[in-house]
């Protein structure tokens, strides 16, 4: 079956999910991102790869961090950037998604960065855009958030280059997390031998083992001999009903404290896709501690998004 993210000759056309992306393309994105890391240190933080191109950030769902890093990434590539907060624009007046897309296409946009609360929205848009337009999924419902998954993997690779001897633990609200799915698909494709998920049963999707992960419900047991600890935000806004007794109870069992982190390897790194709930899924002593690479993740996010945009622009037919 043809992958809708790829051109007929196997190049990247859209970035919608890490699921099903060939290892060669994942490595191409990570290697290209490596070349962009130094751009932020230059006096002139620009490269001309997207000069003359227009990138539209279309956010049907709010996100300060993701929107800002995509904006910075596009501007560092010298693109013209339009940011549309659709919740306050024509959508709220009854315009459909396709109307919005058609209007932006008529303005000769070249790339759409789309965030939407509905799973599958980015795939839907990619199916309906003009042939010259590239679509990047900036998060769709619970489904996928590929650039976040890739920037997490990029961060892991910088601190732990030997991906074939790694144990990674993803901890927390896996059920509602599009980041967890994107990250797990990327890690397993890149050959990481052991990915664990640690969560209460109520916060795990059905048949999660099919993703190729080992499931743990006890934090201390799950963190034993781990190299990378990825904490997930407790997503209160996506929860229906009482999946948890209380935030305090959750922190007691699944919050990452120095005491729990001691079960991982002494040189383990701690990650979080943000925004953090301090005192819910992570203790401040850990978030601000020497094993935390949470702020470098944000920095690398710009390089990874620059890489994705430049590869897509280079693959224009």
From Swiss-Prot:
The keyword Transferase applies. GO terms for cellular component: cytosol. PROSITE patterns: CARBAMOYLTRANSFERASE. GO terms for biological process: 'de novo' pyrimidine nucleobase biosynthetic process; 'de novo' UMP biosynthetic process; amino acid metabolic process. Carbamoyl phosphate binds at residues 65-66, 115, 145, 148, 274-275. Keywords: Pyrimidine biosynthesis, Transferase. It catalyses: carbamoyl phosphate + L-aspartate = N-carbamoyl-L-aspartate + phosphate + H(+). Belongs to the aspartate/ornithine carbamoyltransferase superfamily. ATCase family. This is Aspartate carbamoyltransferase catalytic subunit. It comes from Methylobacillus flagellatus (strain ATCC 51484 / DSM 6875 / VKM B-1610 / KT).
